[in-house]
């Protein structure tokens, strides 16, 4: 996975699978370093794994990240509030996607399963809208 940056873009476009695998490596390293010692269940040592404590932890983290998206763009709050930090909003949206990958990993799903589920759901919506 070569992804050198040139300004704000990557030379290599990562697939969903590449991103999921990279995040899986990050989570594996966090387990090895003991970063989740208060949250992981006994026997949690490799991802993906179905671990309700870590899944729950990441759902709570997702709620925090969603709040940060809303904080970066306050235009939703009322029509007078003009706070909008586009770069910060994009970074927080990326954090949300990363945390969603963690939720999937700690629910026992791999990248292929998640990608297939997303594609299936998107196609269902597309077909439903096409038939309206």
PLM features per residue range, with description:
Residues 1-132:
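Flexible "arm" and connector segments at domain edges
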């Amino acid at each position: 996975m070569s992804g050198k940056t040139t300004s704000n873009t990557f030379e290599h476009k990562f697939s969903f699978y590449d991103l999921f695998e990279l995040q899986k490596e990050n989570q594996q390293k966090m387990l090895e370093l003991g970063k989740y010692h208060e949250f992981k269940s006994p026997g949690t040592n490799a991802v993906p794994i179905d671990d309700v404590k870590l899944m729950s932890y990441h759902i709570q983290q997702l709620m925090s990240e969603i709040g940060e998206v809303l904080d970066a763009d306050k235009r939703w709050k009322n029509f007078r509030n003009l706070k909008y930090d586009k770069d910060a909003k994009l970074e927080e949206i990326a954090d949300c996607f990363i945390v969603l990958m963690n939720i999937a990993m700690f629910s026992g799903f791999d990248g292929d399963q998640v990608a297939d589920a997303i594609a299936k759901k998107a196609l269902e919506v597309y077909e439903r809208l096409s038939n309206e």
